[in-house]
Amino acid sequence: RLRHIYLKNKSKWSKKYLIMLYQSLNYSSKPENFREAVIKGISPDKGLYYPNKIKPLSKNFINNLSKFHIHEIAFEAINQFIGNSIPELKLRSIIEDTLNFDFPLIKIEKQIFSLELFHGPTLAFKDVGARFMARCLEFFNKNSNERITVLVATSGDTGAAVANGFFNISGIDVVILYPKGKISKIQEKQMTTLGGNISALEVDGVFDDCQEMVKKAFLDPQLISKRKLTSANSINIARWLPQMFYFFDGYIKANKFNLPINFSVPSGNFGNLCAGLIAHKLGLPINHFLACTNINDTVPRYLNSGIYKPNPTIKTISNAMDVGNPSNFIRIQKVYNNDFNKLKKNISGYSFNDRETKNCIKNIYQNSNYIMDPHGAIGLSLIHI
């Protein structure tokens, strides 16, 4: 029923983008359309895919966001990135299936709010990207006799969201790699108990080891000749780009207070923050971004020094953000065409240790009667430590 309403009252600013090409950020492979970039996951030259061109949305549309349902806003935001790879009706259906839960904006204290992204089926913000990608891949593979294998590395919530999003999707197998002893018991059960087309493998190492194994698999000619591989990490554009939906949603809810809006983003592999930057590039008038990490502080150090020097991963209580060498940061640099001054103008970086994280959780509960998990607390530790 909603689909018919949208067709009847469709935004007058909607355009049909015939093609969107994605270039490798290593610049040694030919550009691909959305479909091929999603299926391949990573470019043959080992680079991450990035859209060749991003056209800002109409100012009239941006100024009238509050008049539209989130499904319509999501369609307008993602449409140009899909191009002609998915028909409009199908894309709208995918968006409806993806965004079937809310993102409440909860007041913590004056001018400080929590955008709750844990109301999806696995209680992880990655439910949005995983569900969107699963439905895109299902559409792309529906007339094929060849099965697709989705290979994913996880530090916790990605694996659970991907397992749930892809469970029983026809023609697709999922293999999840997770570091031994470094994810929660609940997340481990979410990944290992579904069965069916979902396989979860424990790796004796850290998340960066799992991620490196995934990257090597994509570059193994013998393996890819036998299996059609793709990834469901945020290196995949269909997992990464839909995350901008809730930046639009959060902005609309916060904008009623008529104050500049800053997003403090707890960050690990930096796909979420990068999606927010794409929303900003589309015209969403976000004032500033705060990139907040645990003691795996590669990006905050870079923002302070201009030197990008990854360190080995360190285990923390915010385990899903234990990433020493975040893959998506190269995309963030591309957003600003590798201009450090522009990047630093829009993003500030901060890191917090476990003690500061625990203090934040304690203080927020005592002052506001609000319970935060260690990951969300990283985003507020700048204020409450």
Feature locations, PLM:
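Domain-scale recognition of functional cores that engage charged ligands
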Residues: E212-K216, S225-I278, L284
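Short glycine/serine/threonine-rich phosphate/pyrophosphate-binding segments
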Residues: D127, M133, L151-N164, S184-K185, ...
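Well-ordered mid-protein domain cores that form the structural environment of catalytic cofactors
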Residues: S114-N168
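Conserved small/polar residues in nucleotide/adenosyl-binding loops
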Residues: I383-I385
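Small-residue-rich anion-binding loops in enzyme active sites
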Residues: L48-L123, L194-I224
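Charged, compositionally biased N-terminal leader segments and the immediate start
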Residues: M20-D45, K315
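Active-site/ligand-binding loops adjacent to catalytic centers
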Residues: Q187-I235, R239, A291-I378
